[in-house]
Amino acid sequence: MDRRILTLAGISAAALGLFMRSDRGAAESTPGKFEITKTDEEWKKQLTPEQYYVLRKHGTERAGTSPLDKIYAPGTYACAGCDLPLFSSTTKFDSRTGWPSFYAPIEKAIGTSVDKSFFTTRTEVHCRRCGGHLGHVFDDGPKPTGLRYCMNGVALKFLPEKKSS
């Protein structure tokens, strides 16, 4: 009997978490809220399945799977959905989390919202131009900001700094 109650409680908790996450995502995907708006079909044609899952469905890539986590060359990290420059490589640091991390975004490049999924409250980070989900920001980063913008690498594209001749 106790095992059955525990199983039902676990299933109920998981369903509630999915419901809360789904409700939050729908409210943020309201058409006309961002400069760049597209239908789901347009996004699916433009993005890879992994990019679509993260940017449009608020997914998370598996830790340690993004090659961008280990790139420290000079350049800019832009939104994979709309090419808006989001982070400078000068603010990137090794957070040892398995995701590209930065201590500050480029000014006016991102937006944030409250994410109450998975039984906790976090600050979700999205592209201010297309609304694509990028990751979350935490208050355990290095100086000078003390913030850690923990980004999904699949939501970003790295643009190397052009060498002057």
Where is each model-derived feature located?
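N-terminal secretory signal peptides and thylakoid transit peptides that target proteins
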Residues: 1-14
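N-terminal pre-domain segments of enzymes
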Residues: 30-40
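Boundary at the C-terminal end of the N-terminal hydrophobic targeting segment
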Residues: 25-27
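C-terminal segment of classical bacterial N-terminal signal peptides
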Residues: 18-22
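A generic secondary-structure boundary signal that marks alpha-helix termini
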Residues: 15-16, 159
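A short Gly-Trp-Pro
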Residues: 35, 44-78, 84-165
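Short coil/turn linker and secondary-structure boundary residues
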Residues: 1, 38-39, 47
